[in-house]
């Protein structure tokens, strides 16, 4: 309680304050600090660069610290702090709306899910991560991108960077079930949010390799990927015509 009163009394917050509160999973203090950033933004007390720096809440400790230079959001995702990720993404939404004609602000906010060049949903961390935190992050991140006019190609580019630079066809070709599952989740959310992107998603799913073999046929050749793919398709909220078209591949 005293700690909360201390932060409420502070006129400004530093990147260290927010990073520290996130790392200790102190949801109440995180909320106070995020509210502080929004209030100062609306009063024009801080500029865009400072807002993004505060939202990054990067670790600044010595090299021995595991989270050196990691953003607060990255730490929260990897540690599975679902409530904090949700609160951070809600604040990101408010900031993006404040700078509504500036797509780079959205790009910058979404890039904070990465630890420098390393993605948040890194394969090494993913197996230990809470699936709930991934759902919360992806749903909020994709919604944010779509609300601010990202094209399908821009969404793919954004999340390819999140996934170690691996596009959908590449992960299927490599038998990478972890990243394939993440891509299928993204396709489901994108179409659920905006059916205009259905055609783009279908093109990704039906893409053919040099030998004329479709991505789905490749997935069918791997028992793990096959099970993962058709389980995801069964959960897709696609129009019946497209679902029927996909299901023709089931026996191939």
Residue ranges with predicted function:
Residues 25, 80, 128-129, 175-178, ...:
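Ankyrin-repeat intra-repeat helix-capping/turn positions
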Residues 2-11, 32-58, 86-108, 136-154, ...:
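Ankyrin repeat domain, specifically the short helix-to-loop turn at the C-terminus of the second helix
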Residues 205-252:
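Leucine-rich solenoid repeat scaffolds
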Residues 4-9, 13, 20, 26-32, ...:
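Terminal export signals
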Residues 10-20, 50-75, 105-125, 154-173, ...:
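Ankyrin-repeat boundary/"N-cap" motif
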């Amino acid at each position: 309680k005293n700690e909360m009163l201390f932060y409420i009394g502070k006129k400004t917050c530093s990147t260290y304050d927010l990073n520290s509160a996130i790392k200790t999973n102190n949801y109440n203090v995180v909320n106070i600090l995020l509210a502080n950033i929004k209030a100062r933004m609306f009063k024009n007390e801080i500029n865009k660069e400072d807002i993004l720096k505060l939202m990054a809440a990067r670790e600044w400790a010595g090299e021995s610290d595991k989270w050196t230079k990691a953003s607060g959001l990255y730490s929260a995702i990897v540690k599975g702090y679902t409530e904090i990720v949700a609160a951070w993404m809600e604040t990101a939404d408010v900031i993006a709306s404040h700078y509504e004609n500036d797509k780079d602000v959205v790009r910058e906010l979404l890039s904070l899910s990465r630890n420098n060049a390393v993605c948040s949903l890194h394969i090494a961390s993913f197996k230990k991560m809470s699936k709930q935190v991934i759902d919360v992050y992806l749903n909020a991140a994709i919604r944010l991108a779509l609300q601010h006019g990202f094209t399908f190609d821009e969404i793919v580019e954004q999340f390819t960077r999140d996934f170690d630079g691996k596009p959908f066809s590449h992960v299927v070709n490599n038998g990478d079930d972890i990243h394939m599952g993440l891509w299928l989740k993204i396709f489901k959310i994108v179409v659920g949010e905006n059916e205009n992107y259905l055609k783009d998603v279908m093109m990704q799913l039906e893409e053919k390799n040099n030998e004329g073999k479709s991505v789905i046929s490749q997935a069918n050749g791997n028992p793990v990927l096959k099970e993962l793919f058709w389980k995801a398709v069964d959960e897709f909220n696609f129009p019946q015509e497209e679902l029927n078209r996909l299901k023709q591949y089931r026996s191939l």
